[in-house]
Amino acid sequence: LAEEIREYALDIGFDRVGFASAEPFPQLAAALEERAEDYAWISRGLLQLNKAVDPRSILPSARSLIVLIWDYHKQSFPQELTGKIGRAYLARLFLPKDRIFGARLKLFRDFLKQRGIALGTRPALPDRQAAARAGLGTFGRNTFIYVPGMGSFAAIVTMAVDVDLGGESREAISRCPDDCGACIRACPTGALYEPFRMNPRRCIAFNTYAPGNWPLVPEDIPREIREKMGSWIYGCDLCQEACPRNRKKLQEKLPPDAYLLEKAKTITLTNLLNMDEQFYLTQVQPFLYGYIWHKKFLQRNAAIALGNSGDDAAVPHLARALEDPEEMVRAYAAWALGRIGGAAARAALESRRGREDSAKVLEEIEIALT
């Protein structure tokens, strides 16, 4: 049965398949307890890793874990989009079942159900720990799992099943050199503060997400985080790009992704900043489905990126955003204008100050003008 499952998974497009025991993950449980303040947010929503540390809390009859891995860096990513959107999101990993990755998962789940196999997937199982237990990868100091031939650009899906598939029970290990701290040095916010330790609330990616999708994600991004977000508007790859273990993968000559080449023509910071509902529904939502449930959060992130660019050419676009009906968009446009500075930015802020009735936006304008 295990071989039949493996062959089917490979046939429908997964790149690695492994099996692991369904025993609890005591090291993860201990880490979550030790760092409860950093990880309080994972006790809600789809993640609930505090429950998922024991797969049998998800499927009481669980006997094995199936771990599926897909290499999401098989095609190149346009330079216009890298540095703005994380590669995992550019690869459309988390789209619904009517798109390729979601369809692949549905096919696999249906395959198991047709054979009378019960499965559990929610709350989310600890994918990286499961992949390590199955012998499919090793940990990096940036907390990612590294898979031979893929680096850390590996999409992992774990399912608990009620059949014994002869799974592995390997210890989680790392193959990073003891003296390497490239990922830690590359993290501008200090989210990666020591090897294998991350405070997610300081992570750029975490702060670009939309509240509601992820518990405790702030609507208002702290000022000192904004300044360090650079051009990132959704996700962040800095710790992966800096890693020597990813160097070979990042330097590979890969075929282009035709879909992304088309999206790169329209998904620009200025287009996102001042997008209307039609642009959001036709250009953004099919591309970033489910990641950003309201356009104002992506407009917020685009404003931050434009402010961090320091480019005077962004000032007219940000001045226009000061007229947006959404308070959040106006507030972050004001912050961005203050970040860029100059006479034109100041004139736009002063013009809006006399007409603004939101205390939050006025606060941002006053700070920007000082």
Regions picked out by a protein language model, each given a short descriptive name:
Residues 270, 280-285, 311-323, 342-354:
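Amphipathic alpha-helical scaffolding segments comprising HEAT/armadillo-like alpha-solenoid repeats
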